[in-house]
Amino acid sequence: MLILIIIMDNPIFLPNQVLVAADLKIYFDSIGLLIGAYTIINGIFIIISGYLTDKYERKLLLIVSGFIWSATVIFYLFITQYWQLFLERMLAAIATGFTTPVTISYIADMVSQKSRSKSFAIWGLISAVASVFASIFALSFNTIDFESISGLSINEKINYIRTNFPNQLYTWKLPYLLLGITALIITTINIFLTVEPKRGSKDLYLKESLSDEMVKYTYKIRLSDFKNLFKRKSNIFLTINFFDVVASGLLLAYIFPYIELEIGINVIDARVLVLLLFAGIFGLFLGQFILAHWGDKKVQKGDVSGRVKVAVICSILTLPFLLIAFSMSPNATNDTFFFNAVKVNDVGFWILWIVYCSFLGIGLAFTMGIGPNWYSSLIDLNLPENRGSIVAIGSFVDSIGRSMGAIMGGFIVHATQSFSATIFWSTLIFGILSIFLWVPLFYTTPKDFEYIHNILKERSLNLKEQRKD
């Protein structure tokens, strides 16, 4: 529960970016820098906490994270300047940086190796639901009527909101205050209730040996392990591919301003509900479950690199669907599509809107199918004492890609006044580049899986000897 509240941090901030910009008299170039810096700091502390996760009790890291985050967001109430928000967001980034390695490490030690992709998919669903709740919760305090603001550029709309809605600008702080107090209470409770699972107890070759409560997995990460991690080529290709997340980082950062300022509709509009419905059906069901289950099944049938193959296929198939969706560029204020080139009536708008939502939903499904299989592959390709660290390294590189998307996107949107064009070209360029780093995994993973499995078999024999003693 505590982890779910902490990971709500960004989903609370992103829906109310327009309010934040209007409140603090800034524009999307400053917002982009803020989101980018947050992502980088978050990534740095993911690496630090990944190492700490492999070395110390994860319960302690979770509690520290809870206290830092809750104290930080409660003090958002007193922010009046951009620099204050910047510092506070960096502290929040530190706190959220602890959650990824702790979560992945917990799941790896609580769920059978054969079903890891499915377990990560379930966690993805739970965290997605938490994010949606956080966004809806944040938007419930935002009463700006975006549909009434038409015929203005993005920056002019922000100025209009600042001038005409002065009594509503502070409301972006309220959801943070309420969730911060809740997190503070839950963190205190977790000191007494959280249980630490046994490391390695769900691995295929260690499960039997570690079923004895007297036998513990005593291997700990050493600093010298880091140079050995990347002797396995699969780790290199799985972790350095930041191109894969540049476009998604941009989309995630600006999805709400894109809907409110460029498409020109309120987030609670029926058309947005249709969009979310398609994204939920295709993205969560097909992406998080069907594709994750497919990866698990391939491994269970003896294809040790099956999850990697599914991730590669997803990375390729996501491109055409997202490119078609963002090329449609709907605008509800003047009933047009394709960058104002095609004007339609109300019926035509709904038909094309559903087509747009379908392409976007299928594209998101393949995008979301990558995550569970990627995490599972990283876990399977590394020893239990190294998993938190390798996931942290991969997440840090991801954060670089996402921050690039947010920062570049902020400046490009500020210059071009177009979210659609910015997202379209970033998806095309960085999507093609990422494919070149996915394909080599077809050839590197079988050898690396065999290497790890042989080590775990040997350790299993050693642990069985401990049981006899």
Task: Annotate each predicted stretch with a short phrase.
Residues 1-28, 251-256:
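Extracytoplasmic
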Residues 11, 39-47, 131-132, 281-289, ...:
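Residue-level signature of mid-helix packing/kink "hotspots" within the transmembrane helices
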Residues 13-14, 232-284, 288, 371, ...:
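Extracytoplasmic gate region of multi-pass secondary transporters
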Residues 44-83:
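Conserved MFS/SLC helix-loop-helix module at the cytosolic interface between two early adjacent transmembrane helices
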Residues 60-74, 305-323:
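Structural signature of the two symmetry-related core transmembrane helices
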Residues 88-127:
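Cytoplasmic helix-loop-helix junction between adjacent transmembrane helices
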Residues 123-194:
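Helix-loop-helix hairpin linking two adjacent transmembrane segments in secondary transporters
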Residues 197-239, 262-265, 343-346, 457-467:
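Juxtamembrane intracellular "pre-TM" segments in multi-pass secondary transporters
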